[in-house]
């Protein structure tokens, strides 16, 4: 990347902004809270804190589902908010933008990400749509120009992308509909079955991130929820 460049990863669960020379300048939950179906109430981590707790007149949602934009209006509101918050401090106007997208999405779905940046007031110098496996490999300083194959596995919230790269390109890539949210569901169901105890999605994610392991361990964590036997 030459000159001023901004990289953006629009994940289902979180959104990350990278600026060359500075590193990650924003890492927030990809969540928006809408008041009375029309007004932005909160965005990012602040909106995530309201998830599963908001009153009926506030809708908290994830605009990205399975790697693609599911709600273009809320997504535009969210990205406009983040750009407004960052632009004064990070001078984002006139930069080249690199947008990481899954390999197995349509050209129309890729265009939606492109249009998000075009529709802001940042006057981007140029917008590049980069396939996520390539962005992942470059971010990990992997040399994908060699003739030997490089396997990259990107586990997201709703999907997992498995790719093999060689000679600077993607040889094979598959996007499967299993991600971190499926692990959260498994935790919720396991605790409900074994302990007759109900927890929410946020609590399940906390358990996963704090003591989650592919191996059996003796670690434990205290969480809050509702006992199905007593109702408390």
Regions found by a protein language model. Give the residues of each.
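Nucleotide/phosphate-binding catalytic cleft detector across ATP-hydrolyzing
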Residues: 1-155, 165-232
